[in-house]
Amino acid sequence: MSETRTVSMPAADAPTVDAPWPVSVLSGKIKGWIDRLGTAWVEGEITQWGGSGGNVYGKLKDLDVDATISFTVWSSVRAKIPADLGQGARVVALVKPNYWVKGGTLTMQVLEMRHVGLGDLLERLERLRQTLRAEGLFDADRKRRLPFLPGCIGLITGKDSDAEKDVLRNAQLHWPSVRFRVVHTAVQGDRAAGEVTRAIGVLDEDPEVDVIVIARGGGDFQNLLVFSDEKLVRTAAACRTPLVSAIGHEADRPLLDDVADLRASTPTDAAKRVVPDVSEELSRVQQARARIGMRLTSQVRGEIDRIEQLRSRPVLASTSWIVDSRAEELGRYIARSAELAGRVVERGMQQTSELSRQLRTLSPQHVLDRGYAIVQTADGSALRAPADAPDGTGLVLRLAAGALGATSTGPTDDIPSSAARLPASPAPDARPASGPES
């Protein structure tokens, strides 16, 4: 909220290298231009407030960008402005720029000053909140889990503050070996937002830092507005390292609480939540060991019972049982094999006898034994037809027990009647009735 008047710069002969202006001339012209500017309403945050001789000297910072101006409140005006104004307050002021020629300094003379309306602050804060929410910076799925046991904790807090002491003391009570990297910053005033923002960047770049805690021990609404600074909040949201907000104000939560991965109600609460309690963890380990021991004991007992059951079975109670059962089975196989072998031998002997008989039947000697004779010529050829032995042909009659010599008288039709009753010779192609039995 501001009100300004535009003033045209007075024309003047431009200085040159040969005709430069004296410093006093330049200073006088600057003062003239500034005096013509008149008064203006400005809005900002008081970042410095100090009194001397009834007067107040301070600085006013822009709410959105990094810009600061000095101001002076004369004692005559001091009595007319609210008594509770001071560092950290957000105000609107009617100021008149003054340029001090002798020192070359510019300051704003405060003619009026009042608190910014709480409604205006809340409205501006709510607009920023809605913008950040629309960008997804408050989404739950952006929240990262804190490491179970951080190797090093980055702590951003005021130097020698109660918040620093609370975090260090309680964290070390829970886990004595925990390590910290502490970055001290202003936690209120015009430097706070910038210093906290830079500290987040420094710790986020440190590979040893596993989690970052921003801690302040509470404060009024005005003092906590620094933790709703847009640049600070966006830097916290972009931080790659899990971040914990421990500002410690329940009624008016700063925007930092909404983008942090974890919001702690107090610095003490933050310390307890970023490191585990060593006594609780030891107790859990002991309980786990006890459960594992009981389970292992139960399993061992179960296996022992199974082994005893197996040992009580016949197959394991007497190992000779296996040999005996196999011996009986082997005996049955041997007896069966002997029986089958005997049958095969007997069948073979029968077949051999039959073949021998058949061979004897087919043998020429067998024919001779039956009373027949073989008639051969002198050259040993068997005589088959009468015409082959004309009268006077020498013959040999081969009998079963020897041979006789004879001479043919030629073919004759006079065959003794007894010759017709001689047994017929067996067929020369006679074979055994059947082959070997399989």
UniProtKB/Swiss-Prot annotation:
Catalytic EC class: hydrolase
Q: Which UniProt keywords apply?
A: Cytoplasm, Exonuclease, Hydrolase, Nuclease
* Alphabetical GO biological process terms: DNA catabolic process
Q: Which reactions does this protein catalyse? A: Exonucleolytic cleavage in either 5'- to 3'- or 3'- to 5'-direction to yield nucleoside 5'-phosphates
Broad class of where this protein is predominantly found:
cytoplasm
Q: Which domain of life is it from?
A: Bacteria
A GO MF annotation of the entry reads: nucleic acid binding
Q: Where is this region: Disordered?
A: 406-438
Write the Enzyme Commission number(s) for this entry.
Answer: 3.1.11.6
What does this gene product do? Bidirectionally degrades single-stranded DNA into large acid-insoluble oligonucleotides, which are then degraded further into small acid-soluble oligonucleotides.
What does the similarity note say?
Answer: Belongs to the XseA family.
Listed name of the protein: Exodeoxyribonuclease 7 large subunit
Q: Which organism is it from?
A: Clavibacter sepedonicus (Clavibacter michiganensis subsp. sepedonicus)
The opening ranks of the lineage are:
Bacteria, Bacillati, Actinomycetota, Actinomycetes, Micrococcales
Per the record, the gene is xseA
